[in-house]
Amino acid sequence: MTETTAHPVTTATGTDVRVRFCPSPTGTPHVGLIRTALFNWAYARHTGGKLVFRVEDTDAARDSEESYEQLIEALRWLEIDWDEGEGVGGPHAPYRQSQRTDLYLDVIRKLTESGHLYESYATAEEIEARNRAAGRDPKMGYDNFERDLTEAERQAFRDEGRSPALRLRVPDTDLSFDDLVRGTVTFPAGSFPDFVLVRPNGAPLYTLVNPVDDALMGITHVLRGEDLLSSTPRQIALYHALIDIGVADAIPRFGHLPYVMGEGNKKLSKRDPESNLFHHRDRGFIPEGLINYLALLGWSLTHDRDVFSRMEMVTAFDVADVTPAPARFDLKKAESLNGDHIRLLALDDFAQRLVPYLQAADVVGAELTHDEQRMLEAAAPLVQERMQLLGEAPDLLSFLFTTADALPYDDAAVQALKDDAAAVLAASRGALAGVPHTQWDIDLVQEVLQNTLITGMGMKPRLAYGPLRVAVSGRRISPPLFESMVLLGKDETIARLDRLAGMLGG
């Protein structure tokens, strides 16, 4: 028998589609994991189906509640919601594997009684010895030797004090499936032996509980990472048995998403900073930008358009359009896309999103004062077009939230000034001092400085305005100079020119 003839494969479409996201709560959220969540979410929203959120928390040594909370935080930050599952409820509760043991034991009983599971007492040493005696590679693995043990033979093992593992009787046929991403995948008969589903201590293995949960929850489409492709024929073999005993109605469709690669075409490791979702959030990615980039890790809206909204993704997303080729996490491209989305934000929204980054750098207080809020609103338009990451805000804007006597100067910026910097500052101060407070605006400030430095002293703009930029911001790179001077006001601007002039001995 084959997977396509022995038992039905789901034909679910539209609102009948049920996908799942079932992470293990270990470590911090990995961008590859969140990409998987995003693709499942997008497919559910595109079809009108349901997304189930299930927690695979049966590894007591590695699972942690802290990791679970971080995962929830990541999903909420990206606004990836689910229709059924942990934290939401639903008809298939509970949604944590650690709370579903009784369900697994019932399925194990049915599989055993129906003959799909059989007792296996062999030790690793005995398996190797049999392989060696038969002229096979001793590391070849299990040889299905115990499929047909008699009850007397099983009892003899029990009398030795042995406890059996339970193995699935794998069909002696090719196992094929039509991968939604990769097309037809076939594992020839004999590709793998009967495999253990239940440990000798009675504990069910992941290879049992994951497909059983999918079956009991009516999952129709399994969209997951390419690293799990090799386990799919085992799951299909188990599905044959689950359908036989009435636990499942059909085999789900499988789609294996491409690897996310890091630098040097190596799989993006948890040890790589770029793999940590919160690393990107802390640097100043916004949800819209990161969602857009994660979507491009294996999928695209059109061949010539990279910037799109989440709803545009939902409208267009089909897992059949996902490419099987590995996707490389290109940080520069991700940052560029994030900048595109920053520029799409409404100005007041953009300004408020800067606040946590300014607070984290102690640029503003825990509660913005009236003056701080006013300055932020006025300064936001000066930097929105220039930023790729919100985390750039402290470096770009901190000079606007301090005073001349407290402004820090970048040593490299000061040392790079030309010998005529003091003269430029003196001439600028004299010219600006004559501008009435009531007429201190961008046009007049620019006109006065151009007349003094460009026309009067014959300087090129870059050389003329460099000392002024350092004086005003403390840095070589800043928001537009004249606009910054107007925001600071006449007195503060002149005080900053005086301070740098004093540092230069002018």
UniProtKB/Swiss-Prot annotation:
It is found in: Cytoplasm. Signal peptide: none annotated. Its EC number is 6.1.1.17. GO terms for biological process: glutamyl-tRNA aminoacylation. A motif ('HIGH' region) lies at residues 23-33. One of its GO terms (molecular function) is tRNA binding. Its main location: cytoplasm. ATP binds at K270. Keywords: Aminoacyl-tRNA synthetase, ATP-binding, Cytoplasm, Ligase, Nucleotide-binding, Protein biosynthesis. Pfam families: Anticodon_2 (PF19269), tRNA-synt_1c (PF00749). It is an enzyme of class 6 (ligase). InterPro entries: aa-tRNA-synth_I_cd-bd, aa-tRNA-synth_I_codon-bd_sub2, aa_tRNA-synth_I_cd-bd_sf, Glu-tRNA-ligase_bac/mito, Glu-tRNA-synth_I_codon-bd_sub1, Glu/Gln-tRNA-synth, Glu/Gln-tRNA-synth_Ib_cat-dom, Glu_tRNA_lig_a-bdl. GO terms for cellular component: cytosol. It catalyses: tRNA(Glu) + L-glutamate + ATP = L-glutamyl-tRNA(Glu) + AMP + diphosphate. A motif ('KMSKS' region) lies at residues 267-271. Monomer. Catalyzes the attachment of glutamate to tRNA(Glu) in a two-step reaction: glutamate is first activated by ATP to form Glu-AMP and then transferred to the acceptor end of tRNA(Glu). Belongs to the class-I aminoacyl-tRNA synthetase family. Glutamate--tRNA ligase type 1 subfamily. This is Glutamate--tRNA ligase. The gene is gltX.
